[in-house]
């Protein structure tokens, strides 16, 4: 799964559907991350603007939440791999200073700035947490905060079990849903905590969020997994979004409805001296 492939999927498939947020997983998760920041009082009684760098900002859904709480006291910066996603963010946030690049290069942009808050949301499946952590640390002010939000490999257990039965693998050319070998997400909460600690962060708040998912049929699944961006590389690899009427009937008859859950780690960590 190359950077160019991911970028193309976000530009051509995901960007125009992202804000629809089927199943409300993105919005509900961002609400929890926003609440962590609010209760830590990062937005209260500041003498100057809070410099926020949202890495993997998408269409600006998180920055708009912060600005709804703090208004003009936010100075927003953002990075995203998709030009189309950033265009959507500019429409919502006129003061946004943005750049197009992979999150692996987050430390290469806005070199004149250090930040009070850096947010990395749903990108550790593409850029490993151990790569992100030192780069985030280097761009934060002393005592600054990192809002980390990312899936773990424990997500979608029922989907993984169903998708990897022998009949479905045969139908799709022997290919399986290989989460372990495809995404770079941390294994679990402990891996997140250990990585943050090793890189000079103290976790101030953390939550494991497991929102329930229910897909009545293939169309509902594709709205979430393919067009919504959650499993686009997997769906694209096996051509699930292109199946004909017979395969669609079979899947709706024997695979759906499907109930499952996501698994997301939501952490607010503070930079400390090494």
PLM feature spans:
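A short glycine-rich, Lys/Arg-flanked "PGG" loop and its adjoining helix->strand segment in the class I
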Residues: 130-142
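A short SAM/SAH-binding and catalytic strip from SAM-dependent methyltransferases
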Residues: 117-130
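C-terminal helical/coil "lid" or tail adjacent to the Rossmann-like core of SAM-dependent
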Residues: 6, 13, 17, 21, ...
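Short alpha-helix
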Residues: 183-199
């Amino acid at each position: 799964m190359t950077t160019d492939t991911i970028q193309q999927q976000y530009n051509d498939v995901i960007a125009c559907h992202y804000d629809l947020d089927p199943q409300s997983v993105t919005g509900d998760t961002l609400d929890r991350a926003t609440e962590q920041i609010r209760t830590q009082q990062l937005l209260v009684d500041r003498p100057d603007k809070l410099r926020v760098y949202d890495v993997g900002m998408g269409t600006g859904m998180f920055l708009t939440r912060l600005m709804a709480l703090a208004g003009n006291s936010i100075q927003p910066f953002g990075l995203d791999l998709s030009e189309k996603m950033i265009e959507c963010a500019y429409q919502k946030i006129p003061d946004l200073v943005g750049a197009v690049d992979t999150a692996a290069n987050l430390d290469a942009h806005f070199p004149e700035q250090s930040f009070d808050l850096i947010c990395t949301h749903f990108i550790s499946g593409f850029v490993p947490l151990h790569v992100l952590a030192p780069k985030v640390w280097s761009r934060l002010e002393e005592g600054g905060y990192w809002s980390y939000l990312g899936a773990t490999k424990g997500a979608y257990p029922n989907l993984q079990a169903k998708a990897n039965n022998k009949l479905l693998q045969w139908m799709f050319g022997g290919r399986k849903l290989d989460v372990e070998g495809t995404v770079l997400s941390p294994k679990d909460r402990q891996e997140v905590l250990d990585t943050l600690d090793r890189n000079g962060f103290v976790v101030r708040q953390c939550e494991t969020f497991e929102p329930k998912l229910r897909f009545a049929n293939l169309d509902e699944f594709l709205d979430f997994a393919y067009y919504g961006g959650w499993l686009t590389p997997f769906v694209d690899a096996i051509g699930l979004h292109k199946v004909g009427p017979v395969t669609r009937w079979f899947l709706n008859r024997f695979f759906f409805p499907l109930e499952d859950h996501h698994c997301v780690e939501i952490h607010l960590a503070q930079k400390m001296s090494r």
